[in-house]
From Swiss-Prot:
InterPro entries: AlgH-like (IPR003774)
Pfam families in alphabetical order: DUF179
Family: Belongs to the UPF0301 (AlgH) family.
GO cellular component, one term: cytosol
Name this polypeptide is given: UPF0301 protein VV2869
Gene3D superfamilies assigned to the protein according to its UniProt record, in alphabetical order: VC0467-like (3.40.1740.10), VC0467-like domains (3.30.70.1300)
SUPFAM superfamilies: VC0467-like
N-terminal signal peptide: none
Length: 187
């Protein structure tokens, strides 16, 4: 089982309050563990403020200031000082990984210099930190019914209002959120 390019959707009975109602985009999943980014947990800082704090100046003069008001996301509890940008592929940056034709993840600082300009990716989210699992840990959580999984949809990441992302991810499974029980168990 490889869940790269899938969503982890928290079950209603998720015991860990940090991940309640979270949707996590899985960037990597292999025998060593898994790594992903929460896509529905905005924090109280905008992209523009974050760029000011890390002292990054745009390299292109044509500013697109509306994108600087986007929220930054809490990607997860690991390495919260590290930034990750999920975006629609446009240019290649120093450290980018194209996950699909419609989703890339970049960790290099060069992408920050184009945010807020005409040269920025058409859609993106900035996350600080990531969610990580050691070997076998995610599989154990899946066996405990902590998560649902579904193939990732870029429209949920980039175009769905933040408050609707969990519900839309559940709907991709062909069910309504009200059909989910907050009680875990096995038949």
């Amino acid at each position: 089982m490889n869940l790269t390019n899938h969503f982890l959707v928290a079950m209603p009975g998720m015991k860990d309050p940090y991940f309640q109602h979270s949707v996590i985009y899985i960037c990597e999943h292999n025998e060593e563990g898994a790594m992903g980014l929460m896509i529905n947990a905005p924090i109280d800082i905008t992209v523009g403020k974050m760029l000011e704090q890390v002292d990054v100046q745009p390299v292109h003069p044509q500013l697109n200031t509306s994108s600087l008001t986007k929220p930054v996301y809490n990607g997860g509890p690991v390495a919260e000082d590290r930034g990750f940008i999920l975006h629609r592929p446009k240019d290649f940056y120093e450290s980018s990984l194209q996950m699909t034709e419609q989703i890339s993840v970049t960790t290099s600082k060069d992408i920050l210099t184009v945010l807020g300009t005409e040269a920025e990716p058409s859609s993106y989210i900035v996350a600080l930190g990531y969610s990580g699992w050691s070997a076998g840990q995610l599989e154990a959580e899946l066996a405990e019914n902590s998560w649902l999984t579904v193939e990732a949809n870029p429209d949920i990441i980039f175009d769905t209002p933040i408050a609707m992302r969990w519900q839309k991810a559940v709907q991709m499974l062909g069910i309504h959120a009200s059909q989910l029980s907050d009680q875990a168990g096995h038949a």
